[in-house]
Amino acid sequence: MSVLGDLRYALRLWKRYPTLVVVAGLSLGLGVGATTTMYSVVNRVSHYELGFKDVDRMVIFWNTQPDKGIDRQPPTWEVVQALLKNGSTFEAIGLAQFGGAPVTLSGAAESSRVLQMPVDVNGLSVVGVSPLLGRTYLPEDFEDLIKQKEARSIVISHETWQRRLGGMEDVIGKSFHVDGEPRTVIGVMPRGFKLVPWEDHIAFWAANDLSRIPQARWMVAMGRLKPGVTVAAAEAEATTISRQVMEARGDKPGTTKARVEPLHQAFFGRPEDVLTFLLGAVSFVLLIACANVANMLLAAGAAGSCRSC
């Protein structure tokens, strides 16, 4: 049967059984819509592209203390330095304050409240994403920071560069004010760059000197493992070094243990099993809808046959 013939048959069916056509259309529409939506969610979560270099080697490093009910505790500055100096599993570790901090950015077209994300010297470079303009932080930036007691340079987002600074080509080296203090732009990150997937509104990343607060637990540690190193090996070494640092401070390690998680898992957990189950359940609903529509069409066909007898 041609497409034109199918259309004529559909119109005849619509005139004869308008209620059936509406119910069948709604049933199939809801089933297909729900299945498509759930598939999109599963696909997005399972295949979310972080955009980082060698993301399979990227991890987040926590400390846990089960005896104190602590499941995720950021490592101290001392532990991070000990891992980089004495360890053999981490290529780099960067620290960043997730969540950002509200500040006032002025000196552009107009003053506005924005979010900054404090980072250490490796906080941006650890993910392996090159800036669109300029550079990210270098050790000498932090030497100046220690002398001046405050950050003097910032790396801005592409959105901030375009929307708040007019996309000026000579933005590198320009000075603006953050909460009334002068700051110099040293880099612009690429469009769409996010250190954390759910933080879309970070205006810039600001240098922070953690050496002044060596035992602070306010940052999240993102690490890059050396090639060939497994998560289990990194976790074992991090546990040993964390306990050694605590003992050197005179603290009792107790049940302290490192927890090293692949970055994608740390950000999104393990939702695949649950989402796949939900996708299967929704697909089953679509199957039921198709069966119901088929039964309604068969019943309508049988009724039409009886009337023609």
Q: What role is predicted for each listed range?
A:
Residues 115-141, 150-276:
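Mid-to-C-terminal secondary-structure elements
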Residues 60-63, 77-139:
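Short amphipathic beta-strand/extended segments in non-transmembrane regions
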